[in-house]
Amino acid sequence: MVVGDVTTGTDVLVIGAGPGGYVAAIRAGQLDLDVTLVERDAYGGACLNRGCIPSKALITGSKLAHDAGNAEDLGIHANPAVDLSQMMNWKDGVVDGLTGGVEKLCKANGVNLVEGTAEFSGEDS
């Protein structure tokens, strides 16, 4: 984590690695700009880490269990039991894989990653 002023120059400074931030940073890197991306939490933002993706992963697992238990018309006889701890671990693996992918894409496109918080200050910011 960086505490204090960052005095090194950069062409583009992006604050926040959510879906807008990391895409902007990657594109700037593809354009051969010197780009720095500052993120205080995990890459991907709220949707990837705490919202859309984890929710959909759990819904998918729950639907699979439900469908397996209601498929007797197809000749499938099952009484699935959900191990919530294992399902949560699977969901965490899905999220970790995607956040890791965002980080790798950033690095592959020359984005300098900084863990911390940032703000613009001064008359010209």
Regions found by a protein language model. Give the residues of each.
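Glycine-rich flavin
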Residues: 2-4, 8-9, 26-33, 38-125
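Beta1/beta-strand and adjacent pyrophosphate-binding region of the FAD-binding site
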Residues: 4-20
